[in-house]
Amino acid sequence: MKYTLAFACSQDGFIAKHSKDNPFEWTSEEDQNHFRTLISENEWQVMGRTTHELNPNHNRKRIVFSRQYKEIELIKKDIPDQFYFNPDLHQMSDFEKICSGNILILGGTSVHDFFIYAELVDTIHITIEPHTFNGGVRAFSYINFKDYKPYFLSKNYSYEEKTLNNNGSILISFNKNS
């Protein structure tokens, strides 16, 4: 099982202007193509409830983190591979009983925090888009944007950077070294 975390952010480090902001409205075509590739490479997606509600898709296998549910349960009875999961009440072994294969972690902040803190993430893809939000939703509650690179390098990740387009979109990838 491989865990990949992916998100886009503004050049000042925010993944959204506010909690209901949909990144598909401001991310580049190149980032959206990269995102579609990641979706095709990963069997399951993990996200918070707000992220799921912004972009529902009944055809994708999803685990939706939500503290509103005491039991692991189907989001909708007629969709067999989408579950609510409360990370405060259930163990990773419960999570891994549901999922098999590669997992794409999509956010938001508390979901990112959960997997980074648990040191489960193998690969991190961050697209930095040439927008400035001057505030909003952070990718991590305890890692500042300017500290991403030193933080992940200190956690034994390698670093790669790639220019995506002429507008200034940059893809940064961190890969966990064995």
Role assignments for model-derived ranges:
Residues M1-S178:
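Enzymes that bind and transform nitrogen-containing heteroaromatic metabolites
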